[in-house]
């Protein structure tokens, strides 16, 4: 799989060709000016013989979202707040292309939400009560979600007595908030300028709708503050002398010039995005259309039609006038991943009661991979009194994604997944520490981690098998992207062979997480009914350290790539599992990199590499809370906890290594807050980075986009 290479491009409006509906994109418009621009785009695309387009007219954005869901339209561009709405049930739309702002040399897929005021007005951000306010629209990012989330502590909102809009209506003297129900909240529409039914409309029929409309509300003297994005002032006031008549309100209750938006803003917001259906969404066709439109009508292209431009007196038709182009959004990115945990948290703060917000902040949501981990997690949750609650995903990558969305807080990962999580912006919090012969006198929580040994195990009876004769044999792996079971052995093999064709080195394998149709999954068994073959969770019989060793023990594979403790934990009566209870340690050997073989007791001198300990990861803003809760939990349920083994044990499992490794003595502090690179070490990070040149993952592809 190739690494994701972003493609920068521009975009415009759409056209009409009904002859081949599968090759046609139906773009949704919300006003007559948008519909006219769309038809100009349609006519020009038709002349090119490029992907055809049809222009669909609806009254407002939510109707466009419904039309796409019902397959009556295919695409529309939305701001972050509406991307969130579109991603919810029953719509389930996903962003497929993001608008790019900034400069060609420094493109960015975000913008800044700002509060603009007239110079000389004498108030700060914490003094807005009783003022007049101008908003882009209800539920929109810069105009509503961000500023109202920030101002919520000042609103005296009693959730049980009134909706949030009611509290805002009482907070400001008067407002223009397009899209609000003007019958229910007349004060929020009082400043709006539309006539008759168009007053407070959720479209350009309301003159104060959108970024330019909200700024005009301020310019006209109707409002005292306009909640817009950083480029709005520049687009409407190209002359610096005119811009100097306005200022920004800062979070620290100071003011700054309008060009100081990087230092003085309310929040950084994901850029506007084109959305489509998650299933049968014509994603490739939409991208092909955008690519062709960029090539012919993009920024700085000559001609009467400009994709990122609007006629005099109009702004931001179909797309933002200030956009440079579009970046394709990887398929792994849904609306929640696109918006990110901080933005989603701001939205939750607007929708939940104060008690719900406090409860959410106090608990830790642990992500369990697969049904067996889910079962153990639910036991933990019950014993913790719901201080720890559970989220579940079918793969580790999906759990990492849940943490990125703020739907989970933490999980413990092996080094390979720590690399992935780190690339996505998560940080190590605590390390799984095993018993130590070197530092046995030190408190486990404060003791440095020593790593573990990644080994290649074979049966003693298979006498001719060495590291140098593995090609063509059968292999057992913990899972793709895990350290001892994949990254270390396959990295070594790739370096020796100079090839990334991992499915050609061994004749057959079980590498959970690989393509189920490939030779890398040929040896996998699935569950007791033969289902879920090669899935990277406990449903697959040969998943994980114990599963990979079982694959060898049952003569399915010739070699198992595990950690050295795995052999000890499953031989000489250490395991009561039927398949392991009669296994003898002496019947197994380790393969050394020099081509020799040694007993499993000699792993210190015969291993593939020293691997970093597993560690708990979380978002940086949740790390301190996660650490505090986990240290308290292990005091109750850790190896020497007062409620283990009577009630529950964190580091024991009905099968093996669920949530944490069973040989964990404690979760240890890391000393400061190291980055994932610092925790894993330079050599390991470099080795994984080289291995990722052979193949990446959809999640890494997504995170490369999200963190650019």
Swiss-Prot record:
Enzyme class label: hydrolase
Signal peptide bounds: 1-19
Cysteines engaged in disulfide bonds, as pairs: 28-64, 38-55, 134-217, 176-192, 179-202, 189-200, 250-264, 367-399, 377-390, 424-703, 444-666, 476-551, 500-694, 510-524, 521-534, 592-606, 644-649
Gene Ontology CC annotations of this record: early endosome; extracellular space; plasma membrane; recycling endosome; specific granule
Residues that bind Fe cation 1: 79, 111, 211, 272
Location of this chain's protein in the cell: Secreted; Cytoplasmic granule
GO terms for biological process, alphabetical: antibacterial humoral response; antifungal humoral response; bone morphogenesis; innate immune response in mucosa; iron ion transport; negative regulation of apoptotic process; negative regulation of lipopolysaccharide-mediated signaling pathway; negative regulation of osteoclast development
Family, per entry: Belongs to the transferrin family.
Protein name from the UniProt record: Lactotransferrin
Species per Swiss-Prot/TrEMBL record: Bubalus bubalis
Gene encoding the protein: LTF
